[in-house]
A protein has these predicted regions:
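Nucleotidyltransferase catalytic core that binds NTPs
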Residues: 1-164
Length: 164
């Protein structure tokens, strides 16, 4: 088994926000390698395709040297085993997040006893930042630049991005 401490930060990232990036940057200081896992749930509707979500994530975390991005449509516990991860990191903005993530963590641990979940509280500056807010603003024609990393925001706002 590798001595490298690998943390997975799974999410739909539809799209990845400044709040996500802040959490990823914090995790990158705690672990040898962080893997941003853009997950695909067949029962969920996404605004952005898997390829678009990966591209936005790669652009957004490009300044974090020990961070990689991948897409996965399988079970998180399978990815955890495949990567030899030491934990999954989840950001917590409020009690609702904690309750939801606790249920997920219990299920994962029940199915893989070595599965660990680490909770990091969201930075106060990003508590109100969410992918849902980005999607709502896009639907309403409102500005999203304060919610996304600059290059990601410009890409989302470009016509070429939507033709891909």
């Amino acid at each position: 088994m590798s001595t490298e401490r690998i943390a997975i930060l799974p999410g739909s990232y539809d799209p990845i926000t400044k709040g996500h990036v802040a959490l990823i940057a914090r995790a990158a200081k705690l672990f040898d390698r962080v893997v941003v896992a853009v997950m695909q749930n067949r029962e969920k509707q996404y605004l952005f395709s898997s390829e678009q979500r990966v591209r936005l994530a790669e652009i957004s975390v490009s300044e974090i040297p020990n961070c990689t991005v991948l897409a996965d449509d399988g079970m998180l516990i399978d990815l955890y085993k495949r990567l030899g991860a030491c934990c999954v990191v989840k950001g917590i903005r409020n009690d609702t997040d904690y309750r939801y993530e606790s249920v997920q963590a219990e299920w994962n641990r029940a199915h893989l006893s070595s599965f660990e979940t680490v909770y990091l509280p969201a930075d106060d500056a990003f508590v109100a930042v969410s992918s849902t807010e980005v999607r709502n603003r896009l639907n309403e024609g409102r500005d999203i630049r304060d919610l996304l990393m600059p290059e990601a925001a410009e890409l989302v706002l470009s016509e070429e991005f939507w033709k891909a």
